[in-house]
A protein has these predicted regions:
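Extracellular loop and loop/strand-boundary signature of outer-membrane beta-barrel proteins
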Residues: 39-44, 93-101, 109-113, 154-162, ...
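Residues on the lipid-exposed face of transmembrane beta-strands in outer-membrane beta-barrel proteins
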Residues: 1-5, 56-60, 110-116, 171-177, ...
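Surface-exposed extracellular loop regions of Gram-negative outer-membrane beta-barrel proteins
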Residues: 78, 85, 89, 134, ...
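Flexible loop and strand-edge segments within Gram-negative outer membrane beta-barrel domains
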Residues: 23, 47, 65-117, 132-165
Length: 332
């Protein structure tokens, strides 16, 4: 679904989009048919996948030079599966075993920004940003044998839950300045606060029988880290001639975590030289400092992958990238 329209004529407008999958609804009859077939064997299956997302944007025009916008995104996915084992039609046993696993993950992103045109050569933008990512993996097992009061009665339950997430919020500024037709200068800065929740594990279990009852609850690996990141940058997109174009810039970055501050310079330069209408030569160099790392499984990427910052002992990674080559356009 998508809706858009004015709130205040010629001043304020909105656009909202909603989306949801029908997969879980359409697959429900197939699961029901499968369970009808497997019921005589003492098995019941459960399966579900669904997602939804929401996009919202509101624009407001103060005047020809000044305008403001607000954007919001929210998306969530859920994947569930499980089964129940129980006595088949020909069995005299009395038991019930449930096993379930669920995976949930989602994002929230919100931005509020203001753009202003100072003159025909300079305009700028200021924005506040908020993002949050969270995932949760939970598996449960529930095993019941016999009836309460029977000599062979037992009831056991186990649940394990793993949560990961990262939350960012901060400010960004950017400016575009065109002092001459051959120069397009961009500059600005940003400050972000990171809240890392690499892993939070929770485990709950109990065992019951006619003689004893034991209940266990445990939390572990509940780490929480805060990081502060700031940077300023400037670059010039310089048209030297109709054939040669040069882009050069420099960024200064800073990252503070656990009382330790790391800084770094990140230069970058790129050149494009048109040799004729179809042939060009391009070369570039850039340096980057990586303060945040994605910790993932080496075999498969899952929503439970965790984000981790550098620490007092783990220094940032520095990468230098150089590329050069000739390019030919075959479409002309």
């Amino acid at each position: 679904l998508n809706f858009e329209g004015p709130i205040i004529k010629d001043r304020t407008s909105f656009n909202i989009g909603l989306r949801r999958t029908w997969l879980d609804v359409l697959s429900a009859p197939a699961v029901a048919i499968a369970n009808k077939i497997t019921k005589k064997d003492g098995t019941r299956l459960r399966a579900r996948y669904a997602f939804h997302d929401l996009n919202l944007k509101v624009n407001h025009i103060f005047n020809d030079r000044s305008r403001m916008y607000l954007s919001l995104y929210n998306g969530n996915d859920v994947l569930k599966g499980g089964s129940t084992d129980f006595p088949d039609q020909d069995s005299d046993n009395n038991y019930n075993y449930d096993s379930d696993v669920s995976l949930r993950w989602g994002n929230i992103m919100a931005t509020a920004g203001w753009t202003y045109v100072f003159n025909n050569r300079l305009f700028g933008k200021v924005s506040g940003v908020f993002t949050r990512y969270h995932s949760r993996l939970r598996n449960t097992e529930h095993d019941v044998v016999g009836n309460e009061g029977d000599e062979d009665y037992s009831d056991s339950f186990r649940e394990n839950e793993t949560n990961t997430g990262i939350t960012d919020f901060g400010l960004r500024t950017s400016f575009d300045y065109m002092p001459a037709s051959a120069h397009h200068i961009r500059f600005g800065g940003d400050y972000l606060v990171h809240r890392f929740h690499p892993e939070y594990n929770r485990s709950v279990a109990y065992e019951k029988n006619e003689e004893t009852s034991v209940e266990i609850g445990q939390e572990f690996a509940n780490d929480l880290l805060w990081g502060h990141e700031a940077g300023v940058y400037a670059e010039d997109d310089w048209t030297l001639s109709s054939a040669v174009r040069l882009n050069a810039g420099l960024r200064f970055s800073l990252f503070n975590v656990q009382g330790k501050t790391y800084t770094g310079l990140e230069p970058r330069v790129s050149l494009r030289w048109l040799l004729d209408d179809n042939l060009s030569f391009k070369a570039s160099y850039s340096r980057m400092n990586q303060y945040v790392h994605l910790i993932s499984n080496s075999f498969i990427s899952l929503p439970t992958d965790a984000w981790m910052p550098v620490t007092r002992k783990l220094k940032p990674l520095i990468s230098d990238q150089v590329s050069a080559g000739f390019y030919y356009n075959l479409n002309k």
